[in-house]
Amino acid sequence: MPKRTDLKSVLVIGSGPIVIGQAAEFDYSGTQALRVLKEEGLRVILVNSNPATIMTDPEFADATYVEPITPEVVEKIIAKERPDAILPTLGGQTALNTAIALDKNGVLEKYNVELIGANIAAIELGEDREKFKGVVERCGAESARSHIIHSMDEALKAAEDLGYPMVVRPSFTMGGLGSGLAYTEDDLRRIVGQGLQYSPTSEVLLEESILGWKEYELEMMRDKNDNVVVVCSIENFDPVGVHTGDSITVAPALTLTDREYQRLRDISIAVIREVGVDTGGCNIQFAVEPDTGRVVVIEMNPRVSRSSALASKATGFAIAKIATKLSLGYTLDEIPNDITQKTPASFEPTLDYVVVKVPRFAFEKFPAADPTLTTTMKSVGEAMAMGRNFTEALQKALRSLEQKGSQLDFSHVPEWEVPELIEKAKRPTTERLHQVQRALLGGATVEQLFEATKIDPWYLDQLQLLNEISHEIRKSTALTPEMLQRAKRHGFSDEQIGALTNNQEAVVRGVRQALGIRPVYKTVDTCAAEFAAYTPYHYSSYDEEDEVALHSKPSIIILGSGPNRIGQGIEFDYSCVHASMALRKAGYETVMVNCNPETVSTDYDVSTRLYFEPLTLEDVLEVIAAEERTGGVMGVFVQLGGQTPLKLAQQLADAGVPILGTSPEAIDLAEHRGAFSRVLDEAGLISPKNGTAVSFEDAKKIADEIGYPVLVRPSYVLGGRGMEIVYDEPNLSRYIANATEITTEHPVLIDRFLEDAVEIDVDALYDGTEMYLGGIMEHIEEAGIHSGDSACVLPPITLGNNVIERVRTATLAIAEGVGVRGLINIQFALASDVLYVLEANPRASRTVPFVSKATGVQMAKAAALIGTGVTINQLRSAYKMLPETGDGSTLPFDAPVSVKEAVLPFSRFRTPEGKVVDSLLGPEMRSTGEVMGIDKHFDTAFAKSQAAANNALPTEGKIFVSVANRDKRSVIMGVKRLSDLGFEIVSTGGTADVLRRNGIQATPVRKVAEGSSAEGEGTIADLIVAGEIDMVFNTPSGGEARIDGYELRAAATSIGIPCITTVAEFNAAVQAIEAQRTYEWSVTSLQEHAENLKALQNG
């Protein structure tokens, strides 16, 4: 059946900001979908609030709306654009929930818009826990015994029937948000309380505990002719009880018998038919009781999901692309497989390799959080690896994480430690895999560990096998070919072999290469080599036959950014993808090396060739060698993927690899305190007084000289890792004592902390003679809050022309002095009209996508071409990639205003007592993603950014105000304005007195520390939890007030109301609230903004 001809325009709803549980995989899916829709000749409209996505690049849609994804805003877009259909299955839970709300509000009917890809009935059946239970029963399958509840009383009644422990799962949430395991009534009250609040329908499922069962997923697709394919089976290494996003997962499933697999397949096909998913994909999760084989259906997602991205990358089967074609009316047998070009999509993929995904966590950013893994997802990223066997894929995946201690440790385990390791392994944490492997190494049996962890004995055997090989390596008297070949086939790195044989990594590599033991590169072809593959998508293995084809011209290799983490996220992938696009258009062959299954960069058609490999020196050198053998390498880009490839720059150069763009020497100069200070001195620029310390005595001396407060941090970090503002000597002593590594090579950097300064961020391009300044961003929060967590605005709204000119001159002097070729990011602080240079990063920064979207200039593409020798002058005239005159510092006065806001994951992380971790911002970055608000004026743009970040500002109600003494004078005008607008102001003690003295009516409330009164009057935290407060404004102070502040910020975070912790953000919020009350929001596409900006610049 050919595609439908009645559809002329389609609105795609994106997933918004990167949050835990809903990350870059939806940009990958969405980008594929937009390409398909455009190829099919449809007018494409997109709404997505995340500027760091490839899908929001203006060329991917006809009208791109970077607006909040709320039913109200999407209705405005529908009213303006009048699409024929909405595709809601590629934007995660956000898009599905928005589509359901638009249907319930009557908007779809009002504008005669239909949903494609999934109908409302199918979404409801798949997502509504009670209805889905009925579906499973009608299919003759089994669900866990359960009760649906809508109140706490119902939950307590259900507990009498189900008994403890039990699983709590809210409806219509993603990433297991609000779910958990209740072992006691206290647990039940706490988790159900959260669940009722997080579920948009206030519906929660309580089910019998199936802890310790094996967990599987099947990724399915179905078309309107009832053709069904199973794309991939996925198995969780961890048993039920750990969210699948936090578990190590393996594809294909390795421990199912043929009969068991057939049973899961039959149930899945029956369920997908009964639910009615007939134009797209879904995934279905199962639990299997290891002793009896009893199968229970856990849940389904009637949409493209995190698992779909993993299954796509694992098999080469483009799920999102094919799902989009199905939604337009095609059938599976009409859609060709891109990779083989001979088989249709109705052929199920076959794998002749093993894929392992491992999650990456960020507990170091939230020291107070409980690291136990539960049904609520907590990982911030993931790495994937492929191998010819499980052990090879596992070891490659672990080293892809790039975390200290992520590789397996084969050093001696004393006997006394084994019982302790077995005991620790009973509780699922990020360390469990290592505890299990070490316990086995120390002599524990597979039976003991199966009893403790319920991890399948087959996997425990595989860990035992790795331990045995490590013994063989240790016993080996020399680096023999037999030993090296066996070790390599099971994924041991040169570094691990070196540690076991007391050799340097470089020595092992030298011997291995001299013996001719090199990896070959296999191809992901969807069909186990039954048909030829036309897309070069490779993974390494120590096998026989190399499958890298000869290429006619030297390649340019782009090193990606590895797994997402806090501080290095999708923004860096954006720059890598843009570089590949620009270089391919300019006629180069590009090679992408990356190991992140969520991203656009690891899509098989973004580059000429893709290598799915860890970003370690060993793995990257082998990819370069493979490219050299088959046609040569022009050079490697390390400046686009963040700190991961940057760390390899010098070692690659030492190995004779040509580095494109900024040289390793220039990269080092910018990171090196002394050398960089000389660049500033020559340019007549100043930085805050600073010093480097290798001991506490050093640190104390420097801090005394420059005066407290000081900012202390380790050298060579991204995302403010380990950074802290220290106000006195005792705290400095504590920081130095806790610094993991402080040596001459890794000193601690100490800077004077500039209080009350305005922070400024600049992204610029430099080609050796000319600079193009991309954009000047003014931070809304004061200095001291990490730039990645601070809201910022472009163009700047309070900086005069004189300051902008000084920033421009300083940027040029630094770019020249460092010797940049391509992108540079510089952070300044303006304090008492003195401009200080805080730091310079000669690489793509996390603000590049935001600046590109705000100004309509794609900077990463320009940087890539500069790296190949193109000048800024040529980029202006011949390539038309930069404006003919002027740059981002000369934006017209009435240019649109863009606000970038950070999205923070505090609601995911709880202390062992079940409280949310503190939401206070500081110099260490904690945000997982970002959104953008764009409008004619700052106040509305800021309001949009808050709504997009799920932090919508109230337009009426009660506002709680409690600020530190130093801030009381600064907040009076803002609070008075809110009071005049009709808000009720609620305040504690001292703040209430100050407000009343200034003529502001403030209702006093009890502090947390005071507790409830004898008459039963609750504290401010009680009022927040009861939903009586609409916004919290609290700046931190010391002593008892600090504890008070934490309690009320935690209460605000847990019920999801705005919680503002800085004066600057409060003042911006007051402006935004007033704007929301005064003006009707309008929606404008990026394409319209670009046209308007061009007209202003030319006019």
Swiss-Prot record:
- Residues bound to Mg(2+) 3: Q827, E839
Q: Which residues form a coiled coil?
A: none
User: Which cofactors does the annotated protein need, by name?
Assistant: Mg(2+); Mn(2+)
User: Binding residues for ATP 2, per the UniProt record?
Assistant: R713, R752, L754, E759, G784, I785, H786, S787, Q827, E839
Q: In which pathway does it act?
A: Amino-acid biosynthesis; L-arginine biosynthesis; carbamoyl phosphate from bicarbonate: step 1/1; Pyrimidine metabolism; UMP biosynthesis via de novo pathway; (S)-dihydroorotate from bicarbonate: step 1/3
Q: How is the cofactor bound?
A: Binds 4 Mg(2+) or Mn(2+) ions per subunit.
State the residue spans of region: Carboxyphosphate synthetic domain.
1-402
Q: Which reaction does it catalyse?
A: hydrogencarbonate + L-glutamine + 2 ATP + H2O = carbamoyl phosphate + L-glutamate + 2 ADP + phosphate + 2 H(+)
Please give the residue ranges the record annotates as the region Allosteric domain. Answer: 951-1099
Binding locations of Mg(2+) 4 = E839, N841
Q: Where is this region: Oligomerization domain?
A: 403-546
- Looking at the record, the residues that make up the ATP-grasp domain are 133-328, 677-868
**Binding-site positions, Mg(2+) 1:** Q285, E299
Q: Does the keyword Cell inner membrane apply?
A: no
GO cellular component labels: cytoplasm
**Which NCBIfam families does this UniProt record tie to the protein?**
CPSaseII_lrg, PRK05294.1, PRK12815.1
Q: In the UniProt entry, what is the domain comment? A: The large subunit is composed of 2 ATP-grasp domains that are involved in binding the 2 ATP molecules needed for carbamoyl phosphate synthesis. The N-terminal ATP-grasp domain (referred to as the carboxyphosphate synthetic component) catalyzes the ATP-dependent phosphorylation of hydrogencarbonate to carboxyphosphate and the subsequent nucleophilic attack by ammonia to form a carbamate intermediate.
Listed name of the protein: Carbamoyl phosphate synthase large chain
